[in-house]
Amino acid sequence: MRTCHRASHRDVSPEEWGTVNARRAVVIGGGPAGLLAAAALAPAVAEVVVLDHDELPEAPAHRRGVPQSRHAHLLMPGGMAVMEELLPGADLRGRLVAAGARETALSSDLLALAPTGWFRRWRHRTFVTMTASRPLLEWGVRRAVLDTNPRVTVRRARVSGLRGSARRVTGVRLAGADGGPPEDLDADWVVDASGRGTRLLPWLDVLGVHGIRERHVDSGLANATRVYRVPPGAPDWPMTLVQADPWSGRPGRSGMIVPIEDGRWMVSLGGMRGSEPPKDPDAFLAYALNLPSPLVGRLIEAAEPLGGVHVSRSTSNSRRYLEDARLWPERLVAIGDAAATFNPIYGQGMSAAALGARALAQAVRQHGIEAPGLARRVQRTVARAARGAWTAAVSTDVLYPGVEGGRPTLGDRLAAAYSRRLNHAATGSYTAACALWDVTTLRTPPARLFHPDALLHALTGSPLPALSGPPLTAAERDFLSGLKPWV
């Protein structure tokens, strides 16, 4: 097995460990969820070994093991706040901005057409969201974790199973390299952060843990993404979003322009089952021009493409109700997509994973890593942390025709009617918009939507008339009026 990264080559002295005994934690998966879990465990153990089947690059680069690697990614303010809490002194935000990541204040820097109309741009600069390519975000988190946690190392290895019993996990089994024999790696703690492709349930079956309930809700979303060079004269063009309409009874269609590093736009088109975006470049442009607003299409028609169109259909919502298992092994926790996976169109996966890692860190700090029942307690807390993102994604996706795995209940329809009223109010009310952004950016649980101020605006509607078009600045209008197709 090759060591791909090491945070530091110096030894960690027993004095630095404090009361830590010589014990090892193993984290399966080297993405943001896994690295943040490693940071959560590092203060309580002598060594954290992060295992990933990919060779993790030294610089930002796409890798095969990340199905959404070439599509748009947002790091919500709720997720960023949690990551910085988990990584004190790492200056994650500063690292990412220095590497070229962009920051967008949803309140003032976003052009967004909702099904209920155009959102206004307010003078308040709040709900700052970071946008960058997935490779840059992942690299930034990885370097921040490794540079500030000398007990964490990363190895390239493929995990083929768990070791232990239904009562306690004692390590992992690694597939043999180059056809060689398998290797057993002892561990006092194991965290599964292996993502959408997790094999956790079959591994638990082998240990004697059976009957874990799963739910899958698939709207059939296909994501098509192409990267463009930002046209001259538009270096600060705001993030632009045309949202899908879940209330129309027709397959949803959406488009977004996300500013990313190196003077580029990442343009993602989304279509639910029956309205999937195409891979052909000419058809990709035509699809964008035929969205409810042609703004995304007009902008990319004038931009230089920097590659082909990448399509992904790995977009379903999946949840494993691990917290309800009748029997749960000590010293095993699953976080991130290994526990609950969300439709990536909502941009909440990375932030939800951070919330799960924080739940692990808080539990270890409060109860001690050897506390009986700690793994089950953490798993239940992880489930609560993911509930908001799951509810938001699934309650919307079940409204689309052709959805698999669920149909809207009466409660879903009532929630949809309320959501539509609140969205309409948010087009003309900063207070109502803040309620939506609080929830969609994972700063607060969904109950925030039913606070008195949000309820009042949902009942009374928008206090301002609907906008007839996107709220552009004078400079943006001049740029748009002078657009010419790129050749």
Indicate where each model-derived feature is located.
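Generic enzyme active-site microenvironment
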Residues: V50-L51, V190, I335
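C-terminal helical "tail/cap" subdomain of flavin- and related membrane-associated enzymes
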Residues: A7, A361-V487
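N-terminal Rossmann-like FAD-binding beta1-loop-alpha1 element of flavoenzymes
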Residues: A22-L51
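Extreme N-terminal leader/targeting segments of oxidoreductases
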Residues: M1-A25, P43-V45, E55-L56, L483
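Active-site-adjacent segment of FAD-dependent monooxygenases/related oxidoreductases
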Residues: R70-G140, T225
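FAD/FMN-dependent oxidoreductases across multiple families
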Residues: E261, S275-A389
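Predominantly flavin-linked oxidoreductase catalytic cores and closely associated redox partners
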Residues: T148-Y287
